[in-house]
From Swiss-Prot:
UniProt xrefs under SMART domains: PWWP
Motif Nuclear localization signal location, chain numbering: 75-80
Statement: the UniProt record of this protein carries the keyword Repressor: yes
Modified-residue entries (Phosphoserine), positions: 132-133, 165, 199, 202, 206, 239
Record GO terms (molecular function): actin binding; DNA-binding transcription repressor activity, RNA polymerase II-specific; growth factor activity; heparin binding; nucleotide binding; RNA binding; RNA polymerase II cis-regulatory region sequence-specific DNA binding; transcription corepressor activity
Biased composition (Polar residues): 91-106
One record GO biological process: signal transduction
Positions of heparin binding: 19, 21, 72, 75, 79-80
Listed name of the protein: Hepatoma-derived growth factor
Modified residues (Phosphothreonine): 184, 200
Transmembrane segments: none
Positions of crosslink type Glycyl lysine isopeptide (Lys-Gly) (interchain with G-Cter in SUMO): 80
Organism of origin: Homo sapiens (Human)
Length: 240
């Protein structure tokens, strides 16, 4: 049977059991033929799997005719989609969505290379977008910087004004304080003079007269006592 399987050639629409690594023999259908120019066992068929509606490229050694292998591989299986695949291969072998999906998947499988180009194009677009965003970011950054500089200048000016303003009131307060002190001194100084004018020099023990007058009074008293002491002696001599 293996010899007949190796020599078997399939055509589009043939129903088979396809074997993939990690999966049981799965009901499938041949959708695409290998290139006619190259005929060798290395050529692979595009296979559509019933139940899962997935496609894969398999060689002839992994394909088994459905009718001949139905009893062997057509036993129920718990794998998801397997029982649905058995139903589809019996009741709807030419499912409409299968042809569209197979051709679509074929284009996706056969043309994986343009995707990097598209990715590169997206990268360029992203780069341009990033570049533009960088430029916008610079503009946005520059504007806040200017605003910060302006705000800093305003803050400095305001700080200078605040520093000057407390100094000025102090300077303004000092002259007023000096004027007040001078006024109080002027008010206090004339008081002794008025008291001296009101007081009389004849008042004994007042202590408010000037010290020179007191000294003169003491000298006069001393001279008067001396004269009184000398006077009795002179009188006695005259009597003799």
């Amino acid at each position: 049977m293996s010899r007949s399987n190796r020599q078997k050639e399939y055509k589009c629409g043939d129903l088979v059991f396809a074997k993939m690594k990690g999966y049981p023999h799965w009901p499938a259908r041949i959708d695409e033929m290998p290139e006619a120019a190259v005929k060798s066992t290395a050529n692979k068929y595009q296979v559509f799997f019933f139940g899962t509606h997935e496609t894969a490229f398999l060689g002839p050694k992994d394909l088994f005719p459905y009718e001949e292998s139905k009893e062997k591989f057509g036993k129920p299986n718990k794998r998801k989609g397997f029982s649905e695949g058995l139903w589809e291969i019996e009741n709807n072998p030419t499912v409409k969505a299968s042809g569209y999906q197979s051709s679509q998947k074929k284009s996706c499988v056969e043309e994986p290379e343009p995707e990097p180009e598209a990715a590169e194009g997206d990268g360029d677009k992203k780069g341009n977008a990033e570049g533009s965003s960088d430029e916008e970011g610079k503009l946005v950054i520059d504007e806040p910087a200017k605003e910060k500089n302006e705000k800093g200048a305003l803050k400095r000016r305001a700080g200078d004004l605040l520093e000057d303003s407390p100094k000025r009131p102090k300077e303004a307060e000092n002259p007023e304080g000096e004027e007040k002190e001078a006024a109080t001194l002027e008010v206090e100084r004339p008081l002794p003079m008025e008291v001296e004018k009101n007081s009389t020099p004849s008042e004994p023990g007042s202590g408010r007269g000037p010290p020179q007058e007191e000294e003169e009074e003491e000298d006069e008293e001393e001279e008067a006592t001396k004269e009184d002491a000398e006077a009795p002696g002179i009188r006695d001599h005259e009597s003799l």
